[in-house]
Amino acid sequence: MQFVLVDLPDRVHFYPFSLTRSLTEIRVGIYTIKERWDALLSCESQVFTIPYLQGLYQAPFLEQEDVVSYINATCIPNEAIKKAILNLKEGESLLDEDGKWIASNTKERAIGHILLGDPNAKKTITANFIISAMHLLQINATMIQSDFNQVIANGSSLMVDASNRLICPENIFIAEGASLIGVSLNATEGPIYIGKNAILMEGAGIRGPFVLGEKAVVKMNACIYGATSVGPYCTIGGEIKNSILMGYSNKAHEGYLGDSIIGQWCNLGAGTSNSNVKNTAGPIEIWNQYQKSWDTIGNKMGMLVGDYTRFAIQSSINTGSYIGASANIYG
């Protein structure tokens, strides 16, 4: 059986990250959406996205006529959903209890026909979905814990140098090849995951929940608070709190990053900081690119930053800022 993760029209709620890639590449917790599904299904899934992005993803299923299992990319996977999908027969669909589409087994290739399906061949199950870019920050701590449980069930943590201080070590996992010298890791309030060949320099202090991806670097005296996920090949420093760096991005110097999501291949120049609370402590509005209107989202929000964006040194970013892809920010 081939499994295909599908970007649905509601992908627009994930702007600016959905501008340059499929939702399957969005990171929350330890993994991207695709990595999480692939691990659960024990195979490499394919991606079905909008036309201008489809060329980025190999999709041999489009040239074939076999039955394919299509899966809503925003559905949060678990064993019960996996079992329900594997039990679908050709022509059957799986929905949540509110009628939201989760999966279908069909030879159809037109997404509209896939979503409609046969009204008499639909099964239901309880499911949760990722609904927007800002929702990623709200669920990151929960997803880190869920992913961490899978990691410790399938592997053993690396022993570390005695110069490090580990608080609640049973809640800390350090992957093969990681280097830690003179670091403080406090997992009392949530798990800490350190990926393969990651580097944590002297004096760094980290409180969970926290994820550091493969070959990522934490520089000296960095101060990191949960829930924070740092993707592969990132370099981080300064102070970071409750944020997600998707991967291949740098926030390497002093400055504050809080309640924010940074896309791939971004760079925050030295001294760059964002505000995450208004002086009035009042509600924050952030731009909704899809609806062309302002959404009120609570009293804490930093910035959403699209892929390939660069910040000059000493940039100061307003509360609730929405920055698109490939932007250059000065001041």
Where are these regions (language model features)?
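Structural signal for interior beta-strand "rungs" in well-ordered beta-sheet cores
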Residues: 159-331
